[in-house]
C-alpha cells in the first residue's frame, strides 16, 4: 500500500530538504523556458476584468466572488472560478497579487482551504481607464501575435543575417505598421502610455522647459508628451513631428502643431528637440544622421534632449539591468543588428560625432530612463 508523508499537517509538494546544484539549475532552466506564462496570465486577468476588480476592492476576494463579478458571466461558473483560482495563485507565486489561505489564518487542520486574493503594489501599473498611468498598452503590444511571430524568427534571422521582424513579415516594422491599421493603433497606444509615465516624471525632475519658446518632439506619436509638457509650460509652442501614418491618427492639441515628415530628411526648427525612444531603433550611422539634422535645426546653445535606457558596461543581475537588456533584445527583434540600447559612453560619442560640443548632462527620470542633454 502506498504511504504518504506530510509536514505540519499539510501535504508537501516540491519541498526539498537539501537541494543540490543540479536540482536548483534544472528548476531554473524550466522556469526560464516557461517564462511566457507570466505575461500571458497577467494579460488574461486584465482582459477578464479581474485586475480592475482587485484594484477596486477594499478587501481580499475569493476566485468565486471575482468570477461572479465579471461583466460577462461565465456559463460554467464553477469551472471558471477554478481556473481563475489557479491563475491567481500562480501570479501570487510571482508577487503579482497577494494570497491568503483562510484555513491557515483560522488554524484549521481539516484539510480544507479557501484562498482570497488582493492587489499587490505592482498591480497599480496594470490598471485600465482614461488618464491612468498604466503599462497595459505596452504589455498588449508585447504579447500581440505580431510580436510572438517575430520571436519565432530569431534563429532564422541570425542565420540569414536578417532582421527577425523583416524575416517574419517581409518588410520593415514601420512599413508594416503603416499598412496595418490595427497594429499601428496598438503600437501608438503603447508608445503613448509609456510617454505618459515618463513625461510625468520628466516634468517633476527636469529643469529647463521654461527657457524654451519652440519645442520639437521628434517621433512624438500622437502628441502625448508635448501635450503634457504644454500643460505646465504654456510659454512653449510645440511641434509634434512624426511619419505621415502616425500624424494621421493624432488628435488636435492646443498649442501643438502636428507635422508629418521624415527625420532623416529634415527636422523642424526649435529651441530644443526631444528624442524619446528614437535612437535605439537605429544603427550608429543613422543616429548620427538624425543628430546632425537636430544640430542643423537648433540655434547656437540649443539643446537636444535624448530619453533612452542606459546599458551597464557589464551585465548585472539587477532589475534595472535586466529591463535594459530586455529592451535591447527587443530592438534586435525589430531592427536587427542596427537597433540597440546603448551605454552612456556610446551615446556621448554619437552626439559628439554629430557636432554637439557644448555642455552635457544626464538626469535620471524614472523606470531606468535617463534624460541626456546635449548643447550645440
UniProtKB/Swiss-Prot annotation:
Quaternary data: Homodimer.
Pfam families, A to Z: Dimerisation, Methyltransf_2
A GO BP entry: methylation
Enzyme class at the top of the EC tree: transferase
Top-rank taxon, per record: Eukaryota
The enzyme's E.C. designation: 2.1.1.146
Catalytically driven reaction(s): (E)-isoeugenol + S-adenosyl-L-methionine = (E)-isomethyleugenol + S-adenosyl-L-homocysteine + H(+)
Family statement: Belongs to the class I-like SAM-binding methyltransferase superfamily. Cation-independent O-methyltransferase family. COMT subfamily.
Active-site feature positions: 280
Protein's name in the database: Eugenol O-methyltransferase
Residues that hold S-adenosyl-L-methionine according to the record: 219, 242, 263, 276
Keywords assigned by UniProt, alphabetized: Methyltransferase, S-adenosyl-L-methionine, Transferase
InterPro entries with a match to the protein in the record: COMT-like (IPR016461), O_MeTrfase_dom (IPR001077), Plant_O-MeTrfase_dimerisation (IPR012967), SAM-dependent_MTases_sf (IPR029063), WH-like_DNA-bd_sf (IPR036388), WH_DNA-bd_sf (IPR036390)
The protein's role, per its UniProt record: O-methyltransferase. Substrate preference is eugenol >> orcinol monomethyl ether > resorcinol monomethyl ether.
Gene3D superfamilies from the UniProt entry: Vaccinia Virus protein VP39, Winged helix-like DNA-binding domain superfamily/Winged helix DNA-binding domain
Tissue-level expression: Expressed predominantly in root hairs.
Amino acid at each position: 500500500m502506498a504511504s504518504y508523508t506530510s509536514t505540519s499537517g499539510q501535504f508537501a509538494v516540491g519541498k526539498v530538504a537539501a537541494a543540490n546544484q543540479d536540482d536548483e539549475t534544472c528548476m531554473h532552466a524550466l522556469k526560464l523556458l516557461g517564462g511566457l506564462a507570466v505575461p500571458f496570465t497577467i494579460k488574461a486577468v486584465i482582459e477578464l476584468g479581474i485586475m480592475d476588480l482587485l484594484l477596486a476592492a477594499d478587501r481580499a476576494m475569493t476566485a468565486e466572488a471575482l468570477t461572479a463579478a465579471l461583466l460577462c458571466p461565465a456559463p460554467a461558473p464553477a469551472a471558471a472560478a477554478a481556473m481563475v483560482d489557479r491563475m491567481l495563485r500562480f501570479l501570487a507565486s510571482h508577487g503579482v497579487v497577494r494570497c491568503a489561505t483562510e484555513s491557515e489564518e483560522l488554524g484549521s487542520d481539516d484539510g480544507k482551504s479557501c484562498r482570497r486574493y488582493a492587489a499587490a503594489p505592482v498591480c497599480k501599473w496594470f490598471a485600465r481607464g482614461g488618464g491612468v498611468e498604466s503599462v497595459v498598452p505596452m504589455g498588449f503590444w508585447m504579447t500581440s501575435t505580431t510580436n510572438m511571430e517575430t520571436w519565432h524568427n530569431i534563429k532564422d534571422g541570425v542565420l540569414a543575417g536578417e532582421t527577425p521582424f523583416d524575416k517574419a513579415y517581409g518588410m520593415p516594422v514601420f512599413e508594416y505598421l503603416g499598412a496595418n491599421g490595427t497594429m499601428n493603433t496598438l503600437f501608438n497606444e503603447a508608445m503613448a502610455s509609456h510617454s505618459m509615465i515618463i513625461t510625468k516624471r520628466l516634468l517633476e525632475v527636469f529643469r529647463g522647459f521654461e527657457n524654451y519658446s519652440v519645442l520639437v518632439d521628434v517621433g512624438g506619436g500622437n502628441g502625448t508628451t508635448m501635450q503634457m509638457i504644454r500643460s505646465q509650460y504654456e510659454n512653449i509652442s510645440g511641434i509634434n513631428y512624426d511619419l505621415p501614418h502616425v500624424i494621421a491618427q493624432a488628435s488636435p492639441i492646443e498649442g501643438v502643431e502636428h507635422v508629418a515628415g521624415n527625420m532623416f530628411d529634415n527636422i523642424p526648427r526649435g529651441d530644443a528637440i526631444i528624442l524619446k525612444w528614437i535612437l535605439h531603433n537605429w544603427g550608429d550611422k543613422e543616429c548620427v544622421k538624425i543628430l546632425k539634422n537636430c544640430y542643423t535645426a537648433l540655434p547656437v546653445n540649443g539643446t537636444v534632449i535624448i530619453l533612452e535606457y542606459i546599458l551597464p558596461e557589464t551585465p548585472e543581475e539587477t532589475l534595472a539591468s535586466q529591463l535594459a537588456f530586455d529592451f535591447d533584445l527587443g530592438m534586435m527583434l525589430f531592427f536587427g543588428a542596427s537597433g540597440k540600447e546603448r551605454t552612456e559612453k556610446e551615446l556621448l560619442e554619437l552626439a559628439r560625432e554629430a557636432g554637439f560640443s557644448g555642455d552635457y548632462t544626464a538626469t535620471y527620470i524614472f523606470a531606468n530612463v535617463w534624460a541626456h542633454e546635449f548643447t550645440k
